[in-house]
Regions:
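Membrane-interface helix-loop-helix modules in multi-pass membrane proteins
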Residues: 70-76, 82
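Extracytoplasmic catalytic/substrate-binding loops of multi-pass membrane glycan-assembly enzymes
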Residues: 333-334
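Alpha-helical transmembrane segments of multi-pass inner-membrane proteins
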Residues: 2-36, 50-60, 83, 90, ...
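Transmembrane alpha-helix boundary signature
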Residues: 61-71, 87-103, 114-123, 181
Length: 334
């Protein structure tokens, strides 16, 4: 039965509303966290994730808000260029051209010795791996396109969605620490058993995600004006979550996470200071000694953040749960 055009227009309008575009982004982010926790090409959940990513790409293009994309296309251009490069490598070439390319001599010699006629071959020596890499780009491309369709206010909420999912992975990792090495809480067959990998298959993925969450929490903690509602709750809640994340990065055993943690923490402190405190410095100075005292208390607070962070890191190392530090200095074989 043919759907009337008026009904199609109504459906398109509903699917293209700002709220629906945000829900689509949030849903896709949840799907990625639940099914895209590994980089291996034999993970079964990729059968679900990648086709859905392509569908979300189609949705993002269909409801594209041109004014939202303007001036923000550079990351997409990079991703599309990579996809084009991979697609070119899959184009079959005639034997004469393929055999003349660098690194193909041994294949041509084997074919001559076996008296096998050379077929048309793609540029890549591993078509399956190249095809896997090509389809893997569907996930970041879909995420970028869905994010570009969001309005400014919704983009702020999108960061909150990411932080929430990061905290879910953190809590999941904490439960993994309390279980056995073969606990069913590990979602992937090939994983870092014994490490708090959360919703991921690899300790590095979990640690880097937590590092990103630190920066986002720094932004979130100071994202509102000081007079806004619940601004203090967001500030202290965001900082408290940073303190919760820091020891777990040590425990993951990820050298990448350990090395990136310090600059991420510095970035979070800078975001909090410049977005929340420094912006009020000039009017505060005009208010007299009380404002100066207020500013001084905030400086003490930031200094306390640094001291508390160092203390937490020291405790993690002291109690011998810092596998990341052991691996970094070469005292661990894992």
């Amino acid at each position: 039965m043919k759907i009337p055009s008026s009904n199609s227009a109504v459906l398109f309008h509903k699917l293209s509303t700002p709220d629906m575009r945000f829900y689509a982004f949030a849903a896709f982010l949840v799907i990625v966290f639940l099914t895209g926790g590994g980089s291996r090409d034999d993970i079964q959940s990729l059968i679900i994730l990648r086709p859905l990513a392509i569908l979300f790409c189609a949705y993002a293009i269909t409801v594209k808000a041109a004014d939202q994309w303007k001036g923000r296309m550079f990351p997409l251009y990079i991703a599309w260029s990579l996809a084009a490069l991979m697609a070119i490598q899959l184009i079959p070439l005639p034997p004469s051209i393929w055999s003349a390319m660098a690194g193909r001599e041994i294949f041509a010699e084997i074919a001559d010795m076996a008296q096998i006629e050379q077929p048309w071959r793609p540029v890549t020596l591993s078509p399956s791996k190249t095809l896997n890499s090509l389809f893997s780009l569907s996930v970041p491309i879909a995420a970028m396109m869905l994010y570009l369709n969001l309005e400014e206010g919704r983009r702020r909420q999108a960061i909150v969605v990411f932080i929430s999912l990061a905290l879910v992975s953190l809590v999941w990792a904490a439960f993994q620490l309390s279980g056995s090495l073969r606990s069913p809480l590990y979602l992937y067959q090939i994983t870092n058993n014994g490490s708090p990998v959360g919703l991921f298959a690899n300790r590095n993925h979990q640690a880097v995600m937590l590092v990103i969450a630190i920066v986002m929490l720094g932004w979130y903690a100071a994202s509102d004006e000081p007079e806004a509602k619940f601004t203090k709750a967001k500030l202290y809640g965001g900082i408290a979550m940073i303190f919760v994340i820091l020891p777990l990065i040590f425990v993951t055993g990820s050298r990448a996470g350990l090395l990136l943690m310090a600059p991420a923490l510095v970035a979070a402190i800078i975001l909090i200071y410049f977005r929340r405190y420094l912006a009020r410095k000039r009017p505060a100075m005009e208010k007299g000694e009380m404002a100066k005292s207020w500013l001084s208390s905030q400086k003490v607070f930031i200094f306390s953040m640094i001291v508390a962070t160092v203390a937490l890191a020291t405790m993690a190392v002291y109690f011998s749960r810092s596998l990341a530090l052991d691996r970094l200095v070469g005292s661990s074989e894992v």
